[in-house]
Amino acid sequence: MSLHTSDLVLVPGQQLPPLETISGFQVRPGFFRFFGATVIPGGVNFTIQSHGATSCELLLFHKGEEEPFAVLPFPEHYKIGFVYSMIVFGFDIEEYEYAYRLDGPYDEKQGLRFDPAKILLDPYARSVTGQSHWGCVNHASHGYRARVTHNNFDWGDSRHAQIPMEDLIIYELHVRGFTQDSSSGVKCPGTFRGLEEKIPYLKELGINAVELMPIFEFDEMRNARLIDENQLIDYWGYNPVSFFSPNSSYASKKEENNEGTELKHLIRTLHANGID
């Protein structure tokens, strides 16, 4: 059997056997095409790309802890080109967070600023810790870290309406601003669920498509400042933290990764009502 899984196909329900142990975890080379963290039978596939890195480490943390409880260096044969990939078996999705450390050259003229001590957020993270409450500064000294999310949402037969461009009636909106005020009359103001509650209103207006202002994870407090005793924050969201992570402050429930589930539920319900 080839040591690499780059040429293998992930078959639903099929669990590949681990091949070795690193830092107490059973592992094997991963599926290099699956960037980010992907749940597979028996474990999680971690894949990250870096053009300049000479080494890569996967850091595992207990939820909320400052220091990693395990550091898993990627062996050289877990790398193809610029891509590192590893399957970690026995990964506890509910209790663990993860991040990376990358080493490499430091040459600002070439745009390279590798720091082997710097803890890095996965650029393909699908859920991020540290920003679940709107308008609150992330005081954690470790900054942002990633969570692994389940990929078992039931989309049913959800399909977008495929409305011709010339027939679209588009409503652009800010998820928080659309329902945050009490006049919206929703149970979950300022959230994906709050927007879902307003679908009948959108249909009354004749809307058949919605365009959402940034819904990825962003840090509204990054450039916060007081002007005339008014707190100004980055309300609109053009200050990204993680492009692939739904904004956790837009979740009505603050359980880990509920933002992803609520966003998917919103999309499914919009489609069911003929709205793209």
Predicted features along the sequence, with ranges:
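Conserved, mostly hydrophobic/aromatic
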Residues: 48, 100, 173, 202, ...
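Structural beta-strand segments of beta-rich domains
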Residues: 42-46
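A conserved hydrophobic secondary-structure block that centers on an alpha-helix together
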Residues: 174-210
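The feature marks proteins involved in alpha-glucan
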Residues: 2-41, 69-70, 78-83, 90-172, ...
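Loop/turn elements at helix/coil->beta-strand transitions in domains of secreted/extracellular proteins
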Residues: 168, 205-210, 272-276
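Aromatic- and acidic-residue-enriched carbohydrate-binding clefts of CAZyme catalytic domains
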Residues: 184-188, 222-272
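Carboxylate/His-rich catalytic cores and anion/metal-binding grooves
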Residues: 202-230
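Short proline/glycine-enriched turn/loop motifs at strand-loop junctions of beta-rich domains
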Residues: 49-55
